[in-house]
Amino acid sequence: MKKYDRGWASLETGAALLIVMLLIAWGAGIWQDYIQTKGWQTEARLVSNWTSAARSYIGKNYTTLQGSSTTTTPAVITTTMLKNTGFLSSGFTETNSEGQRLQAYVVRNAQNPELLQAMVVSSGGTPYPVKALIQMAKDITTGLGGYIQDGKTATGALRSWSVALSNYGAKSGNGHIAVLLSTDELSGAAEDTDRLYRFQVNGRPDLNKMHTAIDMGSNNLNNVGAVNAQTGNFSGNVNGVNGTFSGQVKGNSGNFDVNVTAGGDIRSNNGWLITRNSKGWLNETHGGGFYMSDGSWVRSVNNKGIYTGGQVKGGTVRADGRLYTGEYLQLERTAVAGASCSPNGLVGRDNTGAILSCQSGTWGAPKIQFTTQTYNLAKNTRNLRLGVHAYCSWTYLNGSPFGGFQQVYSDQNNVWYVSNYAWGNYESGGTISVTCLNLPGAGA
């Protein structure tokens, strides 16, 4: 290369280096802007999440906030309130990257005080540059994003709206975020709270909960796993396999095709225990009870006896077998001897207590039937058994006794004996006679 060309080469190299340096500086600026934009987008998402939580809080507590706010005095919602009620996670920070703190100011709508409107405003910390405010206002997805540039007015993205902070009772400064929640937005939040969701929403159990009565319009609830309720009213039938009740079961009537088993008493306050056919009441443990198998008699199951320490009373009492009494038989009515009676065989008493019986149609004293029996005994008879008699006695001695030993006696069973024999030097008597009296049960 000739010497006179060296200057141009140096000049070309310097120009190239300058262009490269300019490109690097320009790229660094673009990269810096990119990083800032990403940071502001992240801030916008955080503001959107906070605003969404505030919107849900207002929707759930709409009535309460109506009572605590006016058209000029706001109800203020803080980050702590949203975390304590579960609308924000416990790890959500109280301030953003610039140290600004978000709060929501809820007031009544001036034209329709029954409706609520709100504004989310950041305060404190370091102000954002205007470029950041404009970017974040466009990226906020919940409500209408905006910013505060003059310390008094909230301006929407693309300057689409402008509202004085004083309308919401809010205070802030330049370089801060503002989000407008309109009456329509908050009315929708209230409706979201009242809407019953078909599926579970994580962190929102209230969306699967009814807060008022529901009318099914005579339609069915099918494939229900369990129904938990305090009371139930049914105008038709209730069908099921089993039922368990810890309290009372009440109704006008009940029909059971098989059995009813109770662990305690079955009580009727003003009705009957009614059975049909040849059934009645049965004690399963002991096999006794009462039933009717015809139209006349109440019968004992398995012919069980009836035991009571009180009275058994009736028009007539009949025993097909023997009639026993553990004490006495008391006849309360009296009869008069000689008076007419019917039927024969009745037993009564007179006013002195003497027994009377109905004989041939007339009351009379019992007639004692008796017979006599005479035994003629020879000499030298010892302990001759005469048999069972009511009473026996000497009735004849054949001639004067010659002496000896004569005796008529009985044992404890009314068996009578007689002896007639010599005694010492005295000869026994002659032929003797003993006459015995026979009564019913004693000889007769």
Curated annotation (Swiss-Prot):
Positions of the UniProt region annotated as Constant region: 1-361
Keywords noted in UniProt: Plasmid
Region (Variable region): 362-444
Other remarks on this protein: This protein is expressed by a shufflon (= clustered inversion region that works as a biological switch). The orfs of this region share a constant N-terminus, while the C-terminus is variable.
The name this protein goes by in its record: Shufflon protein C
Native species: Escherichia coli
